[in-house]
Design a protein with these regions (language model features):
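Cysteine-based protein phosphatase catalytic domain of the PTP/DSP
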Residues: 2-94
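A phosphate-binding catalytic loop at a beta-strand-loop-alpha-helix junction
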Residues: 89-109
Length: 109
């Protein structure tokens, strides 16, 4: 599915097969998440908590962009979580709170 299926204020892009990067609005659109086959969500934001814990597997990365050292401490856990989601045949959304920032791209496989 294309990111054009999302509301105008939402943004997500499939960066590699079955791995999406998006903002918090994409992560709150339950219908879109299900439509594109998301099964695992990496929430790279200290500001919010997982919204659908009974419907998707979550990895909550509670960090802020300005904590560069802390970002690197999560890379192995994020990669393992993404790999597991893909191994199980699912799709993964990695999302941030507001804008695409280094914390999301750093953690991508």
């Amino acid at each position: 599915m294309a990111s054009s299926d999302l509301p105008d204020w939402s943004e997500a892009h499939e960066i590699i097969d079955r791995v999406w990067v998006g903002n918090v609005f994409a992560a709150t659109d339950n219908a879109w998440l299900k439509r594109v086959g998301i099964t695992h969500i990496v929430c790279a934001a200290a500001e919010i908590v997982p919204l659908f814990p009974l419907e998707f597997a979550y990895l909550w990365v509670r960090i802020y962009d300005w904590e560069a050292d802390e970002v690197m401490s999560w890379v192995d856990r994020v990669r393992a979580f993404v790999d597991r989601g893909l191994e199980l045949g699912g799709s993964v959304l990695i999302h941030w709170y507001r804008l695409p920032r280094g914390r999301v791209v750093t953690s991508c496989p």
